[in-house]
Amino acid sequence: MLSILSAGIAPALALLSYIYLKDKITEPIWLIIRMFILGALLVLPIMFIQYAISSEFNYDSIFIEAFFQIALLEEFFKWFVFMFVIYQHEEFDNHYDGIVYASSLSLGFASIENILYLITNGIEYAFLRAVFPVSSHALFGIIMGYYLGKAKTHTNYKKKNLTLAFLLPFLLHGIYNFILKGFSSFTLILTPFMVLLWIIALYRLKRANENTIIN
C-alpha cells in the first residue's frame, strides 16, 4: 500500500514543485497545501455525482461522458472552489499566483484519483498515469490559473478571463477524455495532444511570470 501511495502522489508533488519553484515571489506553503487538500477532497463527491448521473440517465455516448459527465463536473468544481476560497485572498496578488493555486488544487485532485486507480488496477500503471492523467490535470490547472490570475490583475477584461478560466480547461479536458475513451490506439493521438498542451502551458507559465510584479 505504501508503494501505491508513493507512486500515486509523487508525480503530482514533482509537478507542483516545478511550478512553485518557477514563481518569482513564493506563495505561503500552508496556503498551497490547503488548496492541494481541497482538490483531494473534491474527488469522492464528484465521483458520486458522476455515478448518479450515469445511473439515472443511462446514455451511451462517449462524447457526453467525456465532455459533460467528466470534464464539465471536474473543471467546474475546481473553478468554483478557487473562486470561493482563494480569488479574494490577500495572498493572491499577482498573475502567476493564479497558476500556483489552481495547479495545487488540480494536482490534489489528480493525486487521489491516481491513488484510487492504482489501488484498483495495480501499480504497473503508475508510469502511464503520471505521463497522461496526472500531468493533464496539471496542465488544465496551469491554463485555468493563468486566466484567473489575468482576471485578478487585468480588471478591464475580468469577465472574459473568468469565463476563459473555466471554458478552456473544460474543452481541453473534454477533448482529452474523448481521445482516451474513443480510440483504441489512443496513445498515438493523445501523445501529440499532450505535447501541444505542454507547449501552451509552458508559454503561459513564462507569460504569467513576466507579468508578475516584484515589490
From Swiss-Prot:
The keyword Hydrolase applies. GO terms for cellular component: plasma membrane. It is found in: Cell membrane. The chain crosses the membrane at residues 1-23, 30-52, 99-120, 129-150, 179-201. Its EC number is 3.4.-.-. One of its GO terms (biological process) is proteolysis. The keyword Transmembrane helix applies. Coiled coil: none annotated. Its main location: membrane. Belongs to the protease PrsW family. Involved in the degradation of specific anti-sigma factors. Responsible for Site-1 cleavage of the RsiW anti-sigma factor. This results, after two other proteolytic steps catalyzed by the RasP and ClpXP proteases, in the release of SigW and the transcription activation of the genes under the control of the sigma-W factor. This is Protease PrsW.
